[in-house]
A protein has these predicted regions:
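NAD-dependent ADP-ribosyltransferases
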Residues: 1-271
Length: 271
């Protein structure tokens, strides 16, 4: 894959899927400087990895992007307190930007604790990026360099737990899977304003950020939230320098949305 298409418009969410970056605007057809920065981050990252990009959108939006490029400062624009591109979350109606998180199933979370690091898929699984790209579970057809990074979602987002369920089931989860049959993963929370200073952090326009190769937990993590049903299996794997970061939380929630809100609100206490 050496070409990426950027479609800016009205979509359910912003996502990159099979070579297309669907960029949803919070107030279409108006585009904010933050949203323009996302688009330019995506173009920069893709071009650095040998892929050209083309934007498909209204002429007025293209003009605003060009105008921004002419007046762009050297300083990055900080995210708004809440990003309203995705309003699927029933409680927040958007993405809260104080925290980011990485979510893992129990077995992977134990390996993370044993190593003391979040690791990219290439390192964690001991496969090449090309091998990971060619796996059937790469449903989005992500390019191989994507697998050299650890990916993060906004702190109140349910996407990580949804992916955990998808991996568990071997298919896309349905409403029942995300409701009464939902089993949450372990969440590793980080302060966004701190993690952006990681020397290997990258902005690629789709995610809040991603980090290449590894993140040493003792240096960066703010809290690790574990469903309390995993406590007995999990606690023997916690290194001494992370014991104060680990918290157990009961999943007494009706669905993935309620759990995402509960765990995010709990994690905010440890910022």
């Amino acid at each position: 894959m050496n070409y990426m298409l950027i479609k800016i418009g009205e979509f359910d969410i912003s996502e990159c899927w099979d070579g297309v970056f669907y960029k949803k605007l919070s107030d279409y057809p108006n585009i904010t400087d933050w949203e323009i920065q996302n688009v330019l981050d995506f173009i920069r990252y893709e071009e650095e990895n040998g892929r050209t990009c083309r934007i498909e959108t209204q002429r007025e939006i293209l003009k605003k992007i060009e105008d921004y490029k002419q007046r762009k400062s050297k300083h990055r624009i900080a995210p708004p307190e809440i990003i309203k591109e995705c309003t699927a979350c029933p409680k927040y109606k958007g993405c809260m930007t104080d925290l980011v998180c990485h979510t893992s199933p129990l077995e992977n979370a134990i390996k993370i604790m044993d190593s003391g690091c979040l690791l990219s898929p290439v390192i964690a699984r001991g496969l090449t990026a090309l091998e990971l790209k060619n796996e059937s579970r790469n449903a989005a057809n992500d390019p191989q360099d994507y697998f050299e990074y650890i990916m993060f979602a906004w702190g109140n987002c349910q996407a990580g737990d949804r992916l955990v369920m998808e991996r568990k089931l071997g298919r896309f989860p349905n409403d029942e899977d995300l409701g009464k049959d939902f089993t949450p993963g372990v969440r590793f929370f980080f302060c966004y304003d701190k993690l952006v200073k990681h020397p290997d952090a990258t902005f690629e326009g789709v995610l809040p950020l991603k980090v290449k190769n590894r993140v040493v937990l003792s240096d960066w993590v703010s809290s690790i939230i574990v469903p309390d049903v995993y406590k007995q299996e999990f606690q023997s794997h916690i290194p001494q320098n992370l014991k104060s970061k680990v918290h157990y939380l009961k999943n007494d929630c009706a669905d993935i949305w309620e759990w995402s809100g509960k765990v995010y609100e709990y994690a905010k206490h440890f910022v």
